[in-house]
Amino acid sequence: MESNQTIKLHCLENRAASGYVTFGSYWGKGTLVIPNFKNDGMDSFVLKNEKKESIPVQSRITAWWPDGSIKWAAHTADASKMGQEAALTAQIKSGEVSEETAELVSMIIRRDDNWLYIDNGVLSLKVPTGKNKADTLAEDIFLNGKLRVKKASPVLYLEEQGNENSTNFDLDGQTKVTRAYKAAIKAVTIEEDGPLALTIKAEGSYQHQNQNKMKFCIRMYINKDSSEIRFVHTFFFDGDEQTDFLKGLGIRFDTVLEGRPYEHHIRFAGELPFKEAAILLNSSYPRLQPAVLKKQLDGKTWGYPEDSDVEKAAADLPVWNRYFLYQDSADHYRIGKQTKSQCCVLSAAEGRRAHGAMEVCGENGGILLGIRDFWQKYPSGLEVTNLADDNASCTAWFYSPEAKSFDFRHYDTRSYQMTSYEGFPWFGASPEGIAVTSECTLSVCSSLTAEDELNTFANRVNKPPVYVESPIAYHEKRAFGYWSLPERKTEPEAFLENQLDQLFDFYKNEIEARKWYGLFDYGDVMHTYDPIRHCWRYDMGGFAWQNTELVPTYWLWLYFLRTGREDVFTVAEAMSRHCSEVDFYHFGPMAGIGSRHNVRHWGCSCKEPRVSMAGHHRVYYYLT
């Protein structure tokens, strides 16, 4: 057994070294045994940046060797302190911690039968855990003592279809009624409780008039001295695909805004900056100079007298209470705004790929809200309603209600066993038990941020930091078994390496060219190309979506280990996310197995354990 072993880490290119990050460390068999390892591991590892400054790090063990030594550990730290490179050292002797680390304590300051009371040094909030947990994830979120968010709640809209006689019908004669479901939280679990990282899991279903449909699992990640809370939302299909169509899915934040309506700002990050307010100080009579509007949108201090032209104009200008950003495809978004629900929606702006973040802010603060993979997992959206009021509702839409409802049904009512290679003669397509995960981040602010800060926030949400060792280091320690490093000394070796490079580049380019995006599709690729139609066989069951056939997950993760390329990591991460969620049955009659390649990810009668085996995603799990 060795002591004081050091692992050298670096942040992947195109990833901002900011915000909190969790990374993995690998230890050879028998090389690391830490007696009396504590749950948070604060005294078991030392993390230092390039300046040799010690950084607090929270740790937990994720895998052991048969001899009881540590194989893999997971560590959480502040990436802004780590910088581009850092070194992690294991300490055999416990108790050797810095003064800063020694002062850290749990962020749960109090708990009772109904609430968890949390204070991370910047944010304070309470999480319902008892009978009163009802439909909220968190309540009373304060920033430095000032209430900014009253509550955070999951939101589900279902379009329910049938054939009964109804006044609500479409041209096809089907009844179509959209209903709003509230969350019914059944269980709240503390998964990690340390001085740097707190993870809380909420599980439940959605309810409308005592009818429960669909399920969810939502994790909240809270970190020391951070004004941000990350929400990882997993939706499970638990309904009837013949009648239940997804119309809206997200998390809503009831936000407190101070100041007058014209001091209530809305901004969207994007290709072009979009910034407006509930009332825009753009008046012909009384005449307001352009400088007034500029000052307003820049969030400058006011102090206008009650009888000023500004106040007179504000009392007689349109009040834009609702703004929304809607990404309707991988290549188009729209921004709309509305005064009242009984009035039309104005199209305010359009573009290609939104950055997926908005800021809603009053005189003394508000929130930033961002969705990861915003355009990749369309139809997504961001919305604020009641912007002019003291209490505005801000929603991160993982599936925007602006979109046509999502249809979970199969493409036919029978199986094409022989002609389309769809397995068995019986009909086996079912979405019951499949899932999909989305992420959003809430950042609470004390004032309107600088213009570039919203885009910086959006970039961090979309491209969070990833810290890894070099391919050489992983190879030397035989992490993840036996594999090779790139070698081009001989002609056959050079040929094979070039083929691997070209193969990855081909699929990376096909994802973009074929637009393999969307909430339930992003991360997967197609199985077989049709040279006659010059497209992939998207409509033939045995040849359409890959669904881990020929294990592209293994190929991509091994390719990442060999190259350390950030673009490879991004594609592999998306595939692991998709294949472990959408292609996999999490409950129901086929729980634990997955669906092989098909037109719909949950299609045909071929349900196989090879699709759902853990080996597909072990690299992703242990590295992150």
Residue positions per predicted region:
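Solvent-exposed beta-strand/loop surfaces of large extracellular or lumenal domains
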Residues: 46-73, 407-419
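Catalytic cores of eukaryotic secretory-pathway lumenal/extracellular enzymes that build
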Residues: 148-150, 154-155, 165, 177-184, ...
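Short beta-strand elements of extracellular/lumenal beta-sandwich folds
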Residues: 2-19, 232-236
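Solvent-exposed beta-hairpin/edge-strand motifs
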Residues: 31-54, 138, 252-268
